[in-house]
Amino acid sequence: VRHPGIWIIAVSSAFVYITQHAVSEWGVLFLQKGKGFSLAGATQIIAFSEAFGIAGTVLAGWLSDKVFRGNRFVPVLISGLLCLLSLGAFLFTAGGYSLNIIYVSVFSLAIGVVYCTVAGLMALDIVPRKATGAALGVVGLASYAAAGVQNIVSGVMIGENDFNFAPVSVFWIVSCLLCFLIPLVSWKSLRRR
């Protein structure tokens, strides 16, 4: 895969996976230790995250093709900002059960749109048809490797700070910001050759 845009997409997708897996894999612990929810309540809140993530991936293609007429950057910007704002609200505000469901639902819907648009649609747009499998393989490899690294880094940060989630929350927020900023500032490299 020689197109430099695929490597940009792979890095962006890696940050998507860091962000998404942070919520899906550490969200229950965060809700319990950071916000005082019971295990049952925390698990129920995070369950909404998974359902809305699926809806976001379904919504991505329709938004990109029908609403924005093939412009991939507008849905990435809008959903990226929604993702960042809802993640910030989830991590840095109190809120009860219902409000936290709204935070994770909006976050997951938005991150689903970012992921599907960047890692799927943009990647397929810029490579020749014969290279799509290799391109998506590179993106997938970077994504899953980053998710694994995120688990290690997050676990160390949470453990080292005695369940003070402020430092790891900054890591997650910065990853969220990078997941949509990277393709937006690299738009010239994300054109078909």
Predicted regions and their residues:
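Extracytoplasmic gate region of multi-pass secondary transporters
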Residues: 3-60, 115, 119-120, 149-154
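A membrane-interface helix-boundary motif in multi-pass transporters
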Residues: 71-74, 153-176
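Multi-pass alpha-helical transporter architecture, strongest
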Residues: 90-92, 170-193
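Hydrophobic core of transmembrane alpha-helices in multi-pass small-molecule transporters
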Residues: 97-119
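A late C-terminal transmembrane helix in Major Facilitator Superfamily
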Residues: 129-161
